[in-house]
Amino acid sequence: MDTADAIVEKLRAQCLARGAAGIQGLARFFRRLDRDGSRSLDAGELRQGLAKLGLALDEAEAQSVCRRWDRNGSGTLDLEEFLRALRPPMSQAREAVIAAAFAKLDRSGDGVVTLGDLRGVYSGRNHPKVRTGEWTEDEVLRRFLDNFDSSEKDGQVTLAEFQDYYSGLSASVDTDEEFVAMMSSAWQL
């Protein structure tokens, strides 16, 4: 195992120790480090971010990680590819059921789930806070969507964000059969 793989394994272990939301939390953390919105991190940003998580890298290690996930020769790591590598490996059955659940939510088929998509498959009408007048139905839908959304809370959930959410949960479910049954029941697939 080379340096970059060892670092990913350490980060993955930290995420799994945090439970089902660990990968999603780390994804949010790294996306916040991307201050310029380039969807990439340079070695300095990576070192700084990992240090905040208690994982110290020297310059050579940070460069190694950046080189591994540098998709365009810019010297920076592609954030989405790096986060994809951090997700615990999932079987094809798990990936397929997550994709099916996402597709059910993505009513418009444009690759993102929005409030408009949710209105067709999820009703907030009977939510206790709607019934008391505290929230509107749209507020319920937005808060539901925020569970899966990245830290920007842009009101859109991509398949990658949906996978981030479920990858941590997947790691805590022993068998594919249990995971598929859970997802099928939750999303009425």
From Swiss-Prot:
Residues holding Ca(2+) 1: 34, 36, 38, 40, 45
Binding site for Ca(2+) 2: 70, 72, 74, 76, 81
Chief place of localization: cytoplasm
Coiled-coil features, chain-numbered ranges: none
Superkingdom of the organism of origin: Eukaryota
SMART domains: EFh (SM00054)
Cellular component annotations (GO), alphabetically ordered: cytoplasm; vesicle
Domain EF-hand, chain residue ranges per copy: 21-56, 57-92, 93-128, 136-172
Pfam families referenced in this protein's UniProt entry, alphabetically: EF-hand_7
Sites of Phosphoserine modification: 38, 40, 74
PTM section of the record: Phosphorylated in vitro by CaM-kinase II and CAPK.
Record: residues binding Ca(2+) 3: 106, 108, 110, 117
Record keywords: Calcium, Cytoplasm, Metal-binding, Phosphoprotein, Repeat
A molecular-function term among this protein's GO annotations: calcium ion binding
This protein's record includes keyword Magnesium: no
Tissues where the protein occurs: Abundant in the olfactory epithelium and the olfactory bulb. Low levels are seen in nasal respiratory epithelium, lung, kidney, cerebrum, cerebellum, brain stem, thyroid gland, heart and stomach.
Subcellular location(s) of the protein: Cytoplasm
Subunit structure comment from the entry: Monomer. Does not form oligomers in the presence of calcium.
Database matches in PANTHER family: CALCYPHOSIN
Function: Calcium-binding protein. May play a role in cellular signaling events (Potential).
The protein, known as: Calcyphosin
Organismal lineage: Eukaryota, Metazoa, Chordata, Craniata, Vertebrata
